[in-house]
Amino acid sequence: MDRLWAPWRYAYVKAKKHKNCIFCRGLKSKSKNYVIYKTKYSISLLNIFPYNNGHVMISPVRHVKDFSLLKEAEIVDLFKTLNKVKKSLDKVLKPHGYNIGINISPDAGAGITGHLHLHIVPRWKGDTNFMPVLFNTKVISQSLGELCRKLQNELC
């Protein structure tokens, strides 16, 4: 079986887990949790342990763990938000492609299991370079704070 090797995420794996959910916390504080966009039914925030620059997580406001528990309005809003965030990433970062997905359960790769969320990960040709393999380092050329401000400005 192939494995995704992301050594820079080890800090997240080993970090003390908060009792309350990152998405629910994000609903209360915009800047502290890198929230870039909120709607009535969804919240979008930058992943602080990104697979790539611009890695955004989008979740329903309601704390549910499975897609099948969402109401139709939440599903529609989630995908409209995904489309809006993607367009914003297109303008701000100009990636060559994306990985977009949902991991449900730890066996499927979910790191946050209690609150459903989807990932949108911008990709560029050659972004799977040698740095993680040789130096246990992921090259992210922009600070989360700077990117957060740019995306907030683009989305609002």
Label the predicted regions.
Residues 72-95, 145-152:
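Long, well-ordered alpha-helical scaffolding segments within enzyme catalytic domains
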Residues 105-113:
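Acidic pyrophosphate-coordinating catalytic loop
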Residues 47-51, 112, 122-123:
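Short glycine/proline-enriched loop/turn "hinge" motifs that connect secondary-structure elements
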Residues 93-106:
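A short glycine-rich, hydrophobically flanked beta-strand micro-motif that places a catalytic Asp/Glu
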Residues 60, 114-120:
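Catalytic metal-binding acidic patch
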Residues 4-16, 122-156:
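C-terminal helix-cap and adjacent tail motif
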Residues 1-53, 58-59:
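Active-site microenvironments that recognize anionic phosphate/pyrophosphate groups
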Residues 56-78, 134-140:
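Short histidine-centered catalytic/ligand-binding loop motif
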